[in-house]
Amino acid sequence: MNSSAQPSRRIASNLLWTPQGLLRNPLVGVAADGRILSVGTCPEPDRCPGTEFYAGVLAPGLVNAHCHLELSYLLGAIPERCGFAGFAGAMSQVRERFSAEQRVQAVEAADAAMWQAGIEAVGDISNGDTAFAVKSRSRIAYHTFVEFFGLRAASAEHLLPLLRHPQTSLTPHSLYSVQDAPLRAIAARGDAPLSIHFMESPGEAALFEHRGPLWEWYAKAGFSCDFLHYGSPAERLVACVPHDRRVTLVHDCCITQRDIDIVMGHFTAPVWWCLCPRSNRYISGLEPPVELLRRNRLNICLGTD
């Protein structure tokens, strides 16, 4: 990439991460507004006037494909390895301990930490308006997935105020927490990508077999599900979401080859499989089957959750 404009910075390093692979001894010209003006090589950066050298690997800005920025205040507040159902239950117990000011401060700190770590774009999940002010003035580019959640919620009307914010779109939380009519309505609405929690725990597949911790939790709480006849989360996904809708499936810890075959046999639009390994280790100790995804040559992205 070359340009007639003069760079305000020249940055050299040992390696540069490019779409074509690693480039040795790179020299990158950067404009004052952050645009990349040129990419070349400089084996001896000491002999290149005005050049900054950083040992290591230069990389483009990173994308955090799945984040719950508004929940940043919960960092360290919930015990490790309590399982998904335990984690969800603990959230409702501890969230009232934090003031609105503490929540906003945690959002600001998390936003700053992501920028410092090289993240320049985030797919953020929102159930409320806590984080929007911070996102509006952040240097990070955010797309906010306004999340529809709840087995007793029949429509997304209560989420309309959140959808008035810039760069937002509606998405269902998961295939186990939304009844059939709202899931189908959301999937048929617009053309923005959907970001769906998928196979984070064994309980998701077990629910469709009328067993497991989610089934027991729902039974105890008096929840009924009108979607268990699909047989599995993957089969429900392809039955309810049009084939040409872009989808990001988040977590994927418990997917099987059959799940992959069902999903990829349906969608003609891109499907991204988003892994959040640190979150999974903290909550359940599970890890996604990375080699299975790689063997199938699937699109993999990363999130912090």
Regions found by a protein language model. Name each.
Residues 57-58, 73-137, 159-165:
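Alpha-helical scaffold segments that flank or form the walls of functional sites
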Residues 68, 127-128, 145-151, 173-175, ...:
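Active-site beta-loop-alpha junctions enriched in small/polar residues
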Residues 61-67, 122-124, 142-146, 168-172, ...:
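Hydrophobic faces of well-ordered beta-strands that scaffold small-molecule active sites
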Residues 173-184, 224-305:
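Active-site-adjacent C-terminal substructures of enzyme catalytic domains
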Residues 71-105, 143-146, 201-245, 266-270:
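Active-site gating loops and adjacent loop-to-helix segments of metal-dependent hydrolytic enzymes
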Residues 1-46:
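N-terminal metal-binding scaffold of metallo-dependent hydrolase/deaminase domains
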Residues 120, 159-193:
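Active-site gating/metal-coordination segments in enzymes
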